[in-house]
Amino acid sequence: MSVKRGRHLFTSESVTEGHPDKICDQISDAILDEILKKDPNARVACETSVTTGLVLVAGEITTNTYVDIPSVVRQTIKGIGYTRAKYGFDAETCAVLTSIDEQSADIAQGVDKALEAREGQMTDAEIEAIGAGDQGLMFGFATNETEELMPLPISLSHKLSRRLTEVRKNGTLGYLRPDGKTQVTIEYDENDTPVRVDTIVLSTQHAPEVTLEQIQADLKEHVIEAVVPSALIDEETKYFINPTGRFVIGGPQGDAGLTGRKIIVDTYGGYARHGGGAFSGKDATKVDRSGAYAARYVAKNIVAAGLADKCEVQLAYAIGVAQPVSIAVNTFGTGKAAEDVLVELVRKHFDLRPAGIIRMLDLRRPIYKQTAAYGHFGRTDVPLPWEATDKAAALKEDVLKLEAN
């Protein structure tokens, strides 16, 4: 059983789509999507780096199609909002360099047995023959403290980041620029229930002529009050809005960016463990991505079934081997069934072999760019297959049967 804690604080952060690292994630996933539109069976491992006036796209891509990578890069940057040189980065004038190789033959031989990717028609033996593209461990998590079954600190942080972008793009606060960060500290009570917002930190890039006082007043009214439930705010809640006083130089001009450097923002805000693998730019044969999605799918269905208040699932793989080398379930003392029973139910109801995950979640589609900002999990704005709770009823039914016997 979990040890009782006193009242305590927990903090998570998010970033806007204009953050340098997030620009890279979106470019990598935009390239992946563009390839998958024409070649669903492509192997893609696409890394991006940005700095002042420069984008470098590198990686390993094996495909039978052609994609105009510089065009995809420029469209993505334009969509984010870097459209003028005075923003420090401009979609039309930045240099775009590419260095793309094919996937290593040594890796390919372990996963190539179904390059035609007939997951829908494959026999069990054929699925078994497709090994994982790498070794590694992945975690999935869910908790019933929010409607989307995500921890509240990361949930609110993402909503604030998204709202910063909304008010910039719709003209409500036209002086905002694309780069920004948010952070939310939540106070939990002795029962690990979130009770109030302790601290909110917002930092946003802005036009040079705007005063700090105006930014602070506008962000409190148009961002914080529009997103954070008033019931969670009290007179003790602390606000730090652009606490350095000025944030004019931002984006790739302010900091270099890299794909895969916001893995905690992408997942659970540090509330759950992380296996270390990044998501963006990787096709679904990479278990770093598909395994983490499957683990979230499993954990969310366990919580949605009422079998635990919170649940963390760990999966681990060996390169070239289809079956996970381990499956672990941790319910932190909140489980309504024993954890070993839950592991057996997971094995029964979820096909966690790489080709099985691809088939189960239909992952050969161009659905990834939309995940590259504002989190891969707990999304209510886009229909992501690993967020479905379609296995919850069957899990609950099996537990009831076991209890009856």
From Swiss-Prot:
SUPFAM superfamilies: S-adenosylmethionine synthetase
Region (Flexible loop): 103-113
UniProt: K(+) binding residues: E47
CDD domains linked to this entry: S-AdoMet_synt (cd18079)
Binding sites annotated in the UniProt record for L-methionine: E60, Q103, D255, K286
Primary localization class, coarse: cytoplasm
Cofactor info, note text: Binds 2 divalent ions per subunit.
Gene Ontology biological-process entries: one-carbon metabolic process; S-adenosylmethionine biosynthetic process
Cofactors named for this entry: Mg(2+); K(+)
Chain positions recorded as Mg(2+) binding sites: D21
Family matches, as Pfam families: S-AdoMet_synt_C, S-AdoMet_synt_M, S-AdoMet_synt_N
GO cellular component: cytoplasm
Residue positions binding ATP: H19, D179, G180, K181, R246, F247, D255, R261, K262, A278, K282
Pathway: Amino-acid biosynthesis; S-adenosyl-L-methionine biosynthesis; S-adenosyl-L-methionine from L-methionine: step 1/1
Compartmental location: Cytoplasm
Enzyme Commission code(s) on record: 2.5.1.6
The entry's keywords: ATP-binding, Cytoplasm, Magnesium, Metal-binding, Nucleotide-binding, One-carbon metabolism, Potassium, Transferase
NCBIfam families: metK (TIGR01034)
Record family assignment: Belongs to the AdoMet synthase family.
Stored HAMAP family: S_AdoMet_synth1
Function comment: Catalyzes the formation of S-adenosylmethionine (AdoMet) from methionine and ATP. The overall synthetic reaction is composed of two sequential steps, AdoMet formation and the subsequent tripolyphosphate hydrolysis which occurs prior to release of AdoMet from the enzyme.
Subunit relationships: Homotetramer; dimer of dimers.
Full protein name: S-adenosylmethionine synthase
Lineage, opening ranks: Bacteria, Bacillati, Bacillota, Bacilli, Bacillales
